[in-house]
Design a protein with these regions (language model features):
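Extracytoplasmic thiol/disulfide redox context detector
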Residues: 1-86, 204-219
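Structural microenvironment flanking redox-active thiols in thiol-disulfide oxidoreductases
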Residues: 69-97, 102-130
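Long, low-complexity, intrinsically disordered polar/charged segments
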Residues: 6, 101-106, 138-142
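C-terminal cap of thioredoxin/glutaredoxin-like
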Residues: 132-219
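Solvent-exposed, flexible loop/coil residues
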Residues: 30-33, 83, 123, 168, ...
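Solvent-exposed loop/turn segments at secondary-structure junctions
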Residues: 49-53, 80-84, 110-115, 145-148, ...
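Extracytoplasmic/secreted envelope proteins and their assembly/folding machinery
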Residues: 58-65, 88-92, 105, 122, ...
Length: 219
């Protein structure tokens, strides 16, 4: 019993978001995916507007992304785990292709989670977006376009390639995957939301640095 207790304490002490370990604070993919981010480190957030945890981490993640400057190429992919999510995925892809996603991203989250609006309904999403400044005709034209359908198929391929089964999940450089859930398990106990999100950002810092160093060494 004493040995077991000491072992647990040692494992807990080894957990550190600033020095993350594969298999604990993050996962290393067996099959890394090619990225198209040029000299920058690609960071992808897989998320869903339906997801309360995605809503909760969004402010911390936005702040982290803004602090990275030109070091990273950041993008979001709205997941599709079942057909009921299709309209929200299509809405995000539409807004992204219109270059309007960032302007209304937080507002959609608030509409869904703070004000409990049924934005999973296409008509209600369209009405909501019109009220927050999106041109309805341009939105609907893009929403129905072949380009959006093509992007959605590409997103589905990414979802399968990265074996994403829950959200939020954040992929760095096509090879490292982390999330608040990784940190919750690693830190043990019951970390508060702010602690959990701060630790996740620290892991992202370390993974971006790791990826950048590997890229520099490969030149």
């Amino acid at each position: 019993m004493v040995v077991a207790s000491l072992s647990l304490l040692a494992g807990s002490a080894a957990a550190s978001p600033t020095a993350p370990r594969s298999g604990a604070e993050y996962t290393t993919l067996a099959k890394p995916q090619a990225t198209d981010s040029g000299k920058k480190v690609e960071v992808i957030e897989f998320f869903g507007y339906f997801c309360h945890h995605c809503y909760a981490i969004d402010p911390a993640l936005n702040k982290w992304v803004a602090a990275q400057g030109d070091k990273i190429a950041f993008k979001r992919v709205h997941v599709l785990f079942d057909p009921r999510m299709a309209s929200m995925q299509r809405a995000y892809v539409t807004l992204d292709m219109m270059k309007n996603a960032e302007a209304v991203h937080g507002k959609i989250f608030e509409g869904m989670h703070k004000f409990k609006l049924r934005l999973d309904k296409p008509d209600l999403m369209t009405l909501f977006l019109t009220k927050v400044g999106i041109d309805q005709k341009k939105y609907l034209d893009m929403y129905k376009s072949f380009s959006v359908q093509t992007r959605m198929r590409r997103n589905e391929q990414l979802l399968n390639a990265y074996a994403i089964e829950s959200v939020p999940q954040i992929v760095v450089d096509g090879r490292y995957v982390t999330s608040p859930d990784h940190l919750r398990k690693s830190l043990g106990g019951k970390p508060g939301t702010e602690e959990l999100h701060a630790a996740t950002m620290q892991v992202l810092d370390a993974l971006v640095a790791k990826a950048a160093k590997a890229r520099a060494g490969a030149k």
